[in-house]
């Protein structure tokens, strides 16, 4: 998959994409991440990309010209353009699975008060929010989105069933996990996990996942 990220701060992404799972996914050719600076497409000598909003109000709005040019520069016929925005539909595991099937995604990061609506109307296919809160810019949201859906790309995770057993898969939160030592500060690993009985272990894990979901996220069971 190819992922183009358009923002005003491409250097923001260097660390997260150069470590751990996302780094290995790129090295294996499963994921290609390209960064584009929207300022490079400004048609003025000061590379200005924002201006005051019509109608008044606080803050600045990203102008349509540089954003549109940046999108069109990387866009292909099969590309899907996503704008990271608190006004978008809230991201969930189902959406992550859907995005993992795409061949080319363009992630548009907003800054200031947002982007001129004409760009969203003409160039953007979908707006996605990572939660009901506001960040200083869309870069963090793009990192979260990319990390979340990339886990569903075949081969990205070490074990093929790893993503299938995570929280929200099957409509439940994840079950508790334990590793060595068997006893730590007086707390022991549940006996069922030491039994070797895979049927009982699976039953216990489902019960624990259901219990945690009922306590913390009962809305998932509604």
UniProtKB/Swiss-Prot annotation:
<keyword id="KW-0808">Transferase</keyword>
<dbReference type="InterPro" id="IPR029026">
    <property type="entry name" value="tRNA_m1G_MTases_N"/>
</dbReference>
<dbReference type="InterPro" id="IPR002649">
    <property type="entry name" value="tRNA_m1G_MeTrfase_TrmD"/>
</dbReference>
<dbReference type="GO" id="GO:0002939">
    <property type="term" value="P:tRNA N1-guanine methylation"/>
</dbReference>
<keyword id="KW-0819">tRNA processing</keyword>
<dbReference type="InterPro" id="IPR023148">
    <property type="entry name" value="tRNA_m1G_MeTrfase_C_sf"/>
</dbReference>
<dbReference type="GO" id="GO:0052906">
    <property type="term" value="F:tRNA (guanine(37)-N1)-methyltransferase activity"/>
</dbReference>
<feature type="binding site">
    <location>
        <begin position="130"/>
        <end position="135"/>
    </location>
    <ligand>
        <name>S-adenosyl-L-methionine</name>
    </ligand>
</feature>
<comment type="function">
    <text>Specifically methylates guanosine-37 in various tRNAs.</text>
</comment>
<keyword id="KW-0489">Methyltransferase</keyword>
<comment type="similarity">
    <text>Belongs to the RNA methyltransferase TrmD family.</text>
</comment>
<feature type="binding site">
    <location>
        <position position="110"/>
    </location>
    <ligand>
        <name>S-adenosyl-L-methionine</name>
    </ligand>
</feature>
<keyword id="KW-0949">S-adenosyl-L-methionine</keyword>
<dbReference type="InterPro" id="IPR029028">
    <property type="entry name" value="Alpha/beta_knot_MTases"/>
</dbReference>
<keyword id="KW-0963">Cytoplasm</keyword>
<dbReference type="GO" id="GO:0005829">
    <property type="term" value="C:cytosol"/>
</dbReference>
<dbReference type="Pfam" id="PF01746">
    <property type="entry name" value="tRNA_m1G_MT"/>
</dbReference>
<protein>
    <recommendedName>
        <fullName>tRNA (guanine-N(1)-)-methyltransferase</fullName>
        <ecNumber>2.1.1.228</ecNumber>
    </recommendedName>
</protein>
<dbReference type="InterPro" id="IPR016009">
    <property type="entry name" value="tRNA_MeTrfase_TRMD/TRM10"/>
</dbReference>
<comment type="subunit">
    <text>Homodimer.</text>
</comment>
């Amino acid at each position: 998959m190819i992922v183009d990220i358009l923002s005003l701060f491409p250097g923001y992404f260097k660390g997260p994409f150069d470590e751990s799972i996302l780094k290995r996914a790129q090295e294996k050719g499963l994921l290609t991440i390209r960064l584009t600076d929207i300022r490079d497409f400004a048609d003025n000598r000061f590379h200005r990309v924002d201006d005051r909003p019509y109608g008044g109000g606080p803050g600045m709005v990203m102008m349509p010209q540089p954003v549109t040019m940046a999108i069109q520069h990387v866009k292909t016929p099969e590309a899907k353009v996503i704008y990271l925005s608190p006004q978008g539909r809230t991201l969930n595991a189902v959406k992550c699975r859907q995005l993992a099937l795409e061949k080319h995604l363009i992630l548009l990061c907003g800054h200031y008060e947002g982007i001129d609506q004409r760009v969203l109307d003409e160039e953007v296919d979908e707006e996605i929010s990572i939660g009901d809160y506001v960040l200083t810019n869309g870069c963090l949201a793009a990192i979260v989105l990319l990390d979340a859906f990339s886990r569903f790309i075949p081969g990205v995770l070490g074990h093929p069933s790893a993503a299938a057993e995570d929280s929200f898969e099957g409509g439940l939160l994840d079950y508790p996990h334990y590793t060595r030592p068997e006893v730590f500060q007086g707390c022991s690993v549940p006996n069922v996990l030491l039994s070797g009985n895979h049927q009982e272990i699976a039953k216990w894990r489902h019960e624990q996942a259901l219990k945690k979901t009922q306590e913390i996220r009962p809305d998932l069971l509604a």
